[in-house]
From Swiss-Prot:
Prodomain positions: 23-60, 74-82
Cysteine disulfide links: C64-C69
Extra facts: This peptide is an evolutionarily optimized stable analog of somatostatin. In addition, it adopts nearly identical conformations as in the somatostatin drug analog Octreotide. As this drug, it contains a D-Trp at the same position, whose synthesis is a common strategy used for enhancing the metabolic stability of compounds in drug design. Consomatins evolved by gene duplication of a 'Somatostatin and related peptides (SSRP)' gene expressed in the snail neuroendocrine system.
Name of the protein: Consomatin Ar1
GO molecular function: toxin activity
Organism lineage: Eukaryota, Metazoa, Spiralia, Lophotrochozoa, Mollusca
Sorted UniProt keywords: D-amino acid, Disulfide bond, G-protein coupled receptor impairing toxin, Hydroxylation, Secreted, Signal, Toxin
Free-text domain note: The cysteine framework is C-C.
Signal peptide start and end residues: 1-22
Length: 82
């Protein structure tokens, strides 16, 4: 896994430095990696929406491992009739 990490890091370095070596500016290369419609407001909306969606599905004390969560106890479902 550590080797794969360094391979990705080296590929990113080549991907960023190759256009710079051809006379491009580093800031232009970095801005080229960012989508045109991505703004700080959209980033905050995405982060806020995902945080609230997670809390609606799972209570705060629930522990999930690798995105696998145990089933909710019956007392958490108020609409379930026994």
């Amino acid at each position: 896994m550590q080797t794969a990490y360094w391979v990705v890091v080296m590929m990113m370095m080549v991907w960023v430095t190759a256009p710079v070596s051809e006379g491009g500016k580093l800031s232009d290369v970095i801005w080229g990696l960012v989508p045109d419609d991505l703004t700080p407001q959209i980033i905050l909306q995405i982060l806020n929406a995902s945080r609230h969606a997670y809390r609606r599905v799972r209570p705060r004390g629930q522990i999930c491992i690798w995105k696998v969560c145990p089933p909710l106890p019956q007392w958490i479902h108020p609409l379930v009739k026994r």
